[in-house]
Structures are given as structure tokens and as C-alpha cells.
Amino acid sequence: NTTVSTLLAEKLGVPMINFTFRQMAVERNMDFWDFCALANRDDNIDRELDRRQVEMAMAQENCVLGSRLAIWMLKDADFKVYLMASDMERARRIFKREGGSLEERLNQTRERDGHDTERYGRIYGIDNNDTSEADLVIDTEGKTPQMIVDMIIAALPKNC
């Protein structure tokens, strides 16, 4: 998501907003997975992250917001894109970026998804598996970031 968001923002000549759990973990000098476990116990972490992202996006005339919840958080966005990939594909990407074992990354990905789905439902009443809020849903499996950006650009309405 970050790579696609960055490339898309560059292509459109607009800022890219992408404040993430990883960045919050770094701010707090915490391991990412420990921070995720903390977020599962403290709903204020999600609220802070999402508030900060929305504030950053609203401060821009136009931007690309790279966020797991962007299609639900920015109701008035001109165009909402949801990128999806299988658990295995996402685990492969994390493994390539961070190392470890692929099996461990797959288990962590599935565990995180389960916790995220439960948390988003509890905090916001959002079913993050329901992509009906999106204008465009792309299965990223087997596609390069540039291919995905090209698909988004092709689907953008003329007024965006």
C-alpha cells in the first residue's frame, strides 16, 4: 500500500499521507508487534492514529491517503481505492522487507487481521472486509506497484 500510495501521489503531483502503526511504534520506541498487542488493549491508539491521519489529509487541498481505513474515514474523498491481497502475498511482502520466517509472517498477518477486524468493528462499527465504500477495488496479487498505479489512474474520474 505504501509503495502504491507513494507512486500514485508522485504521478498526480499531490502529497501522500500515510501515518501508520509502524510510525507510532517508532515514536514510542516499541517493537511493531508489541505495539499491535498494545493497540488490541487500548482503543485510544486507533483513535489517535486515525484522527492524526484525517487531520493531515484535511489540511491538504488534494492528497493520496494511504491507510487501511481510508475508504471509511474520509467520507467526502473524491475517489476511494481499496487494495487487497491474499494473506500469503502480504506475508511474502513483509518477509521480503523484514526477514524472519515466512510461516511466522503468515501467522502474524492472520493474527493482525483478526485483531484489526475485531477492533475496527468495536471502535467504529466498520466491517473492514466490506469494500462497498470503495470506488475501485484492486486485487494486487501478481501485479507490480506501477501496474496498480496505472489501473488507478485509468479509473480516476476526470474531475480528480
Name what the model sees in each region.
Residues L102-M151:
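Small-molecule kinase domains that catalyze NTP-dependent phosphoryl transfer to phosphate-bearing small molecules
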Residues R90-F95:
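Acidic donor-binding loop at a coil-to-helix junction in glycosyltransferase catalytic cores
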Residues I71-A77, N129-S132:
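Short loop/helix-cap segments at secondary-structure boundaries that form the rim of catalytic
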